[in-house]
Amino acid sequence: MKYKRIVFKVGTSSLTNEDGSLSRSKVKDITQQLAMLHEAGHELILVSSGAIAAGFGALGFKKRPTKIADKQASAAVGQGLLLEEYTTNLLLRQIVSAQILLTQDDFVDKRRYKNAHQALSVLLNRGAIPIINENDSVVIDELKVGDNDTLSAQVAAMVQADLLVFLTDVDGLYTGNPNSDPRAKRLERIETINREIIDMAGGAGSSNGTGGMLTKIKAATIATESGVPVYICSSLKSDSMIEAAEETEDGSYFVAQEKGLRTQKQWLAFYAQSQGSIWVDKGAAEALSQHGKSLLLSGIVEAEGVFSYGDIVTVFDKESGKSLGKGRVQFGASALEDILRSQKAKGVLIYRDDWISITPEIQLLFTEF
């Protein structure tokens, strides 16, 4: 079995009728495929949209609401109804499901990140299928992941999945918009996510985007940098999930980095919030970015910001101004200032295990999304 642990992301369009309401037949089809994969020995996580679609009708709305409060209320009702559909269908095959609602704070806060990771690990080891969504009924903008594509990538990275599958209304990434460009071709294998790939997906200055593809490329960057390959394929075929797991479905495959980021490094790269800035000399910059060394106090040129022991700071090359990465400091700002002023700077500010270098792909993620 090539892909034992798989995260599937199913969007609203794959779960709803033409009027925007929840399609029970589509939910049933998804759960049947999950059951077959589960019985074959796969460990599965489903990141599912559809809470608003499941709930707005029950509250008397004639169509999907647009006001935030109405959508949150619909999600509050619909999340339970959606989970009931999944649970009922899975229990018919003696499979236990579990609901987990997450916000961005569950990834940013180191303790909550660890707790979520542990809970998911127990569920998977016990044979349950976690069904995950963002906590749309209460989340505010500051704590939003923003979309379930990104959420699914964050979850896949957290649990070190073997594959992340996006089921969408487009069967992969195309060189152009296949709906309007007859010359558009599907890319079957993407080795590196770069500016060209972002433009194909609908980046700035491009009109090629289809199927919310840009957010999927953002998500694919998080996943592949964390060592998780990504598959984008159509949800329109009846056995699309099974075929994706077996790599027989038509789609676009994004290759994972050989040395994917460990959980601690993922947190540093994607979620840890910087409390200050450090500028280093050329020697320290090379030691960090090229040789994987710790950051010595002797290589520090300048420090800025209010930070304490154990906080995260961003490190820059003083000569080029380039951001090198982020790390956890062994001294607070005041203590560091005293050390630098004394000109007796000996010791380590950031150990290599508490450091993450910013690769071109990760830098692109920060600047383009």
UniProtKB/Swiss-Prot annotation:
Protein name listed in UniProt: Glutamate 5-kinase
Listed SMART domains: PUA
Keyword Metal-binding recorded: no
A GO cellular component entry from the record: cytosol
Catalytic activity: L-glutamate + ATP = L-glutamyl 5-phosphate + ADP
Keywords from the UniProt entry: Amino-acid biosynthesis, ATP-binding, Cytoplasm, Kinase, Nucleotide-binding, Proline biosynthesis, Transferase
Organism lineage string: Bacteria, Bacillati, Bacillota, Bacilli, Lactobacillales
EC number: 2.7.2.11
Enzyme class: transferase
Binding site for ATP: K9, T168, D169, T210, G211, G212, M213, L214, T215, K216
GO BP annotations, alphabetical order: L-proline biosynthetic process; proline biosynthetic process
